[in-house]
Amino acid sequence: MNTLIGKTGIVVRNIQRAELDSIDALGRLGVATVHEAQNRKGLLSSKMRPIQQGTSLAGSAVTVLVAPGDNWMFHVAVEQCRPGDVLVVSPSSPCTDGYFGDLLATSLQARGVRALIVDAGVRDTQTLRDMGFAVWARAINAQGTVKETLGSVNLPVICGGQLINPGDIVVADDDGVVVVRRDECESTLVAAAERAGLEEEKRLRLAAGELGLDIYKMRERLEAKGLRYVDNIEDLEG
């Protein structure tokens, strides 16, 4: 499938999606937990930032390749979206123009799309926040775009430095964005839920006053690294 990266003039109408209940569960677990649960893979660039705060979600990726400074394929992609999807967009060459604003967001909301992940710029951000339409973007930029050059819809793209296939699960929150392969959805969900349970146990122990030094059995390793304790700074003199 990677040989399809960068191809243009193609729209794939039918893609496979994971079960919505599993997607929603990944969204509740959050980016950090999911990223750790899949051995720290799939995390998009830290430059992909939310324009809003307090939103955590997941959805099936509808992928879009656009030309620099050209948002034509956004409009093409809207037709291919279903409720629960997340639109994932990448330019064929780096560009931070404002590809997306409130009108396209209105169209996507009408299709039940949950969010936009775009490796480029967006604008109308205050209106987008007022609408409750979630966006993670590389830039905020009022510079507009044209509608002239073909791209693709539902072919693999590289977004935020990660390969994203149509139908992969995208999890996004205040910490960033992580991608989960569609065929790894269930196994990742099991691992992430287990990790969340263990973290809750540790949280309760920490709240009760236990030290991370003891919970994580750090003392012997610290000693082996050469860490030593002295009662007073004067003990180091002479």
Curated annotation (Swiss-Prot):
It is an enzyme of class 4 (lyase). This is 4-hydroxy-4-methyl-2-oxoglutarate aldolase/4-carboxy-4-hydroxy-2-oxoadipate aldolase. It comes from the Bacteria. InterPro entries: LigK_PcmE, RraA/RraA-like, RraA/RraA-like_sf. The keyword S-adenosyl-L-methionine does not apply. GO terms for molecular function: 4-hydroxy-4-methyl-2-oxoglutarate aldolase activity; metal ion binding; oxaloacetate decarboxylase activity. It comes from Pseudomonas putida (strain ATCC 700007 / DSM 6899 / JCM 31910 / BCRC 17059 / LMG 24140 / F1). It catalyses: 4-hydroxy-4-methyl-2-oxoglutarate = 2 pyruvate; 2-hydroxy-4-oxobutane-1,2,4-tricarboxylate = oxaloacetate + pyruvate; oxaloacetate + H(+) = pyruvate + CO2. Keywords: Lyase, Magnesium, Metal-binding. Mg(2+) binds at D124. Its EC number is 4.1.3.17, 4.1.1.112. Substrate binds at G101, D102, L103, L104, R123.
